[in-house]
């Protein structure tokens, strides 16, 4: 591996340690240092470049142009669209590069005009302000693009200012929503349901403007009556109170909804906080799944009292099953504080009694970005929250924990990290590691280490010039499980000169080793492969390179399967076997559609009457030479295939050497065995749902009798749980079979195959892998990795069948589209 592709990062031996500066809430010094002199050997980080680098069509825009969602999609704000890069761990692709699915959210063609009054009144006021003889009014009005988004002689304000991903489970497919803020202050919520096209669900700027117009631009009835729009101060006030600065999603919360029969049911909802230019915060509440304007439950406005707000983030704290939430707001003048958010009718949530000031000094250091990470304090034996914020070239941190004495606040700054202002900050939610970057291509890793009093940071320097060459950085984002770091780069200075043209690229580097990723997958509490795509992609890359599964991973996984038997470990084993199978495949040297040189010559020799004898002899000689060359090539390929056999043997295969074809057949047999085990486990789950939700003999859409017969058809399958469950269901069905019938010929569809149903007339229907009903329609859904298909829910389906149809793929945990 070349030096450009891999670099050991960490401060040099002669690099001075950054000075530490720590203050508590009252401004006094604390004893704990916040930055250690340098990283210990256990914290040294090895970063490796991953291909491909994704080129962007347009220049990036906005302050934080890069964001990584929980469902492994990277959004990049550009001057014409939001580029969305989805990381896919494709088990059917033998290539070692990252598999990235690319889509985009285009910017609206028309400019956004904030609603500050009736159209006639607004037009008259604009004409009045533009022709005013007072230069403080006319010039302010003409130069402010908030008042003139069209630009007149200036180019229109296109592009995106900021994007924010919702948590998983918010759209109809159980994935993330994208909130996008354009440069002309239009805030929309976008969804991607078919993986090819993004659709706008709602325009929140328009809805909020209509609400303000209906209330005469007053937030409460106690406020003074609205002023005259012809007054320039009132004109500015109405614009600033609906100009978004930032927006952030909360985690999914549960609310109580009362039915008509006075029964209560739990309804999932999510909150979107929008920070406006005047300091107000609008908190939108959406019912899930979010499908459009009808999913909006409420919108409440909070007055923060912060002048020149610049950024916000959700603070969510959980301790002893009690949850507290608030909004962390930062100012361009320096202060940072938490505002209480009263979540009415939200189960298990409590609110702060009053705002909590995290930093009160008006030191003119603008708060650029805020992140909040939940952690566990090993000394205090309780949960805590780590808040980090970029302020100039410094990192402000604050540790919040609740004890018997109340809310404890420890805060300080980490200095000496960058010589230029920090342009982007991101945090790993798994362990609290913070990454910062400046525009000179330097990235810092800050690892929090708890002390008796508060905490300190081990920090390391990642020089991107050692990995990519001379580059400038514009944003970073860490993957959900901390395996990758995405970086927006352009060319740096060459020979002391800036590049003529800027080519914006999204680069990826690894932050974890294969051993760390494998250990995290084995000990994961999530137990969902799709939610850990970045980790399993590292494992995929390792197996494709080495062409064998490491012995330690194989043994550890077998122990997990024997001890727990959880289907997550079976799915992990299936994933490893599939990647191993792909690593053993021969990569075609030529395109499959091209005819080979050897075949064309043989056809010419065998066909009679094609030229004279000399030509035939020449062609025959040529064909023999081609055949000989082909045999030589095959022998060379056979020689190259010895390497994977050796590596497989080293990976724990104690027997003699076997041909690659036999090894592939052996792996294929193991894959089919694991798939059959996962199929039976899911069949048991489906039968359990049938037993719980049917009281009498009922003909559901699920082929219950066929599932029972299929499970008991294998004599080697001895599962006591399945036998007891089938016995109870058989008693409930009372000798009824309710067979499926073909929609074309009305013949019975026997349940003899888990993948398809074939009637006596030869009509073939694919089976839904979630309910095992035959999909007798032209349209159906498919999982992300094309492992299985599923039918669409219909209105007559009961709720429990609809819940089954919302399940992920039983083989790869991927969502179904």
From Swiss-Prot:
GO terms for MF: DNA binding; histone H3K14 acetyltransferase activity; RNA polymerase III general transcription initiation factor activity
Cross-link named Glycyl lysine isopeptide (Lys-Gly) (interchain with G-Cter in SUMO2), sites: 221, 624
Region annotation (Disordered) ranges: 1-40, 603-658
Residues recorded as bearing N-acetylmethionine in the entry: 1
Protein name as annotated: General transcription factor 3C polypeptide 4
Gene3D superfamilies named among the record's database cross-references: YVTN repeat-like/Quinoprotein amine dehydrogenase
Sequence positions bearing Phosphoserine: 600, 607, 647
Role noted for this protein: Essential for RNA polymerase III to make a number of small nuclear and cytoplasmic RNAs, including 5S RNA, tRNA, and adenovirus-associated (VA) RNA of both cellular and viral origin. Has histone acetyltransferase activity (HAT) with unique specificity for free and nucleosomal H3. May cooperate with GTF3C5 in facilitating the recruitment of TFIIIB and RNA polymerase through direct interactions with BRF1, POLR3C and POLR3F. May be localized close to the A box.
Subunit organization: Part of the TFIIIC subcomplex TFIIIC2, consisting of six subunits, GTF3C1, GTF3C2, GTF3C3, GTF3C4, GTF3C5 and GTF3C6. Interacts with BRF1, GTF3C1, GTF3C2, GTF3C5, GTF3C6, POLR3C and POLR3F.
Gene expressing this chain: Gtf3c4
Family statement drawn from the similarity comment of this UniProt entry: Belongs to the TFIIIC subunit 4 family.
Main location: nucleus
An annotated GO BP: transcription initiation at RNA polymerase III promoter
Reaction catalysis annotation: L-lysyl-[protein] + acetyl-CoA = N(6)-acetyl-L-lysyl-[protein] + CoA + H(+)
Keywords: Acetylation, Acyltransferase, DNA-binding, Isopeptide bond, Nucleus, Phosphoprotein, Transcription, Transferase, Ubl conjugation
Record EC number: 2.3.1.48
Record's subcellular location: Nucleus
A cellular-component GO term for this protein: mitochondrion
Primary enzyme class: transferase
